[in-house]
Amino acid sequence: MALNKSMHPRNRYKDKPPDFVYLASKYPEFQKHVQTTLTGRVTLNFKDPEAVRALTCTLLKEDFGLTIEIPLERLIPTVPLRLNYIHWVEDLIGGQGNPQRGIDIGTGASCIYPLLGATMNGWFFLATEVDDICFNYAKKNVEQNHLAELIKVVKVPQKTLLMDALKEESIVYDFCMCNPPFFANQLEAKGVNSRNSRRPPPSSINTGGVTEIMAEGGELEFVKRVIHDSLQLKKRLRWYSCMLGKKCSLAPLKDELRKQGVAKVTHTEFCQGRTMRWALAWSFYDDVPVPSPPCKKRKLEKARKPLTFTVLKATVAELQAQTPHSSPTESVSAWLENILTDLKVLHKRVPGGEVELSLFLTAVENTWIHSRQKRREQGRHLRELPRAQEPPSEETSVTEQQQQPDIPPESPANAEALQHFLFKCLVNVKQEEEKDVLVEMHWVEGQNKDLMNQLCTCLKNALFRQVAKPT
């Protein structure tokens, strides 16, 4: 299943994927690699490195005005994925157009992160590279796009990450980016050690030199070395970040940062095509805002979806018969208010229109569970009675009443009780086209959303029970 809808919201390819027909008509080199199916659909063979390279070069030219060269024996980046990372860095550092300074660890032959960052946002980059071929291509790509004033490509020794690259620097950088080698050995690179044997093979080709795709210990150990460097550099960079090819690497790396006492940590997901990547970022600055991880965003989105049930037209008509001269929404709302009063759930009306009414609820005690238990107990007791009992004599009744302790009347919830509420929610009662009435319960805040689920079920059942009572 394609993941394009989960791309970063600012990614230009999120809602408008590349138009292969248009690109093929404009760029002859790209046109060589497109294929037309029997149904007339234009496709690209993503297992062909030349086709992937043609697409990358074409998109960079068409959408960013960049001209680059990439050798087939080195890593060929996909533009939507790299763009996701750039946009996330924008979120970390708090701006798209501000002049910022960044470091790209292992920039690759394409030098794609610095080229995109400089072109889109005017960022300054220090781009490091250990491989001779990648270094030469990266320098050439920077020069032919006239970006040498913004991007400095430097050749560094093997296993150099941040410490050696910055030993002669005194500048404070805003961020670093890194696309580390994902694999520890050839078997991993070929997918032999996949944790899921049922996982389908990759839909795209895996190009790249040895230093680009493999490192001792794989990406886990590589990123731990970046963390080790960051512990020495600390505030020389505002944000440290690394991309990850395996989700299973995320938890141990977060644990490592926690052990080292790093408080500002966040992560994200990069979704594109059929590929997912993850990224981790951390900072030693107290004043940097930390973007929410995607899982928290999804929980917030899920929380916004209301619980609903529908009161059908026939049921609404019965309610209206019992409450004359009232609209469908007014009848349903009035019955809901009666039930809520019986349950001792605080509620008040919120101004609304003719076709929609709203109630704001504050639950301070779980009375609906007690109500259900009480009904069950009454039913069980009635079933166990052998015969109808004689009504108590007036004398007995008076005696029992005298023996009962004084029970104070129910008092409304005080301010202290309201401070310790179970949850608050907004109930919307809406009339639909077929004269049905829709009841929505929107979570506002509280201890546990399951409590609102229980109350929703209780309201629905109580409403229908009242309608079903013989008149």
Curated annotation (Swiss-Prot):
**Where is the region Disordered?**
375-412
GO CC annotation: cytoplasm; nucleus
In this entry, which stretches build a coiled coil?
none
Ways its activity is controlled: Methyltransferase activity is autoinhibited by the K-loop region that blocks S-adenosyl-L-methionine-binding. Upon activation, K-loop changes conformation, allowing S-adenosyl-L-methionine-binding and subsequent methyltransferase activity. mRNA N6-adenosine-methyltransferase activity is inhibited by zinc.
* Region described as K-loop: spans on this chain: 159-163
**Gene3D superfamilies according to UniProt:** Vaccinia Virus protein VP39
Q: What is this protein called?
A: RNA N(6)-adenosine-methyltransferase mettl16
Q: Which organism is it from?
A: Danio rerio
